[in-house]
Amino acid sequence: MTFLKRVGEYVSDAFKAAKYIGQGMGVVFDHMNRRPVTVQYPFEKLIPSERFRGRIHFEFDKCIACEICVRVCPIDLPVVDWVYNTELKKKELYSYSIDFGVCIFCANCVEFCPTNCLSVTEDYELATYDRHELNYHQVALGRLPSKVTEDPMVTPLREFAYLPKGVIDPHDLPTGSQRAGKRPEEILAEMRAAKAAEAKEDKTAAEQSN
C-alpha cells in the first residue's frame, strides 16, 4: 500500500508540474504575439505624455516668497529662504531649493503658485550616485531640460500605452502623429459635442411628448 501510495503521489505531482509548466508556456506564447515592451536606453528614450510630471522648473525673478508651495506640499519639501526689505516693506527671496530625492512629484506647488514661477518639465533623468546631488537649488532648478526629440543621438519613442490605433511598433510612428493621450482642446471638443448631442436628444424627446 505504501508503494502504491507513493506512486499515486508521484503521478499527481507530475500532473501538477505539467499543468504549471503549461500555464507558464501559455504566458510566454501569449507575449510572443505582442509588441515589445523594452527600450534600448540610452540610445532610445520614451517621449513623455502631455501630462507627465517630471522635474520642477523654477523662475527666480517671478517668486514672491509667499511660501504657498511649502504649505500645499504634502511633505513640506520646498525650502524658501527670504529676507524682509524694510525700505520696500516686502519679502525678498534669498534662496530656493527642492530635494528630488524626497519629492513625490504631485505638482501641488505648481498648481497653487500665484505667480507661475514653478512648472513641471519632461525631465525624468535624475539618477545620481550621491543622493545629496538631488537637492536642487534655484540655479539648477532654473535650467531647462533638453527634449528627447532634439537629441540627434537618441531615437525618441512614444509611450507604448499611447500609441495610435493600428500602430504596434513605436519605431514606425507616422510623421505628424499626436504624441500621447488627448490634448486639452480635443477633450473640450468631445465634451461640447456630447453636450450638444444630449441637448438635441432632450429637444427631440420634448417635441415627441408634445
Curated annotation (Swiss-Prot):
Enzyme class: translocase
InterPro entries: 4Fe4S_Fe-S-bd, 4Fe4S_Fe_S_CS, NADH_quinone_OxRdtase_chainI, NDHI
Domain (4Fe-4S ferredoxin-type): residue spans on this chain: 54-83, 94-123
Membrane association type: Peripheral membrane protein
Cofactor: [4Fe-4S] cluster
UniProt-annotated binding residues for [4Fe-4S] cluster 1: C63, C66, C69, C113
GO molecular function per UniProt: 4 iron, 4 sulfur cluster binding; iron ion binding; NADH dehydrogenase (ubiquinone) activity; quinone binding
GO cellular component, one term: plasma membrane-derived thylakoid membrane
Disulfide bonds: none
Keyword Nucleotidyltransferase among UniProt keywords: no
Coarse class of the protein's main subcellular location: membrane
Source superkingdom: Bacteria
Pfam families the UniProt entry points to: Fer4_7
Protein family according to the UniProt entry: Belongs to the complex I 23 kDa subunit family.
NCBIfam families per the UniProt record, alphabetical: ndhI, NuoI, PRK05888.1-3
Protein name: NAD(P)H-quinone oxidoreductase subunit I
UniProt source species: Synechococcus sp. (strain JA-3-3Ab)
Gene: ndhI
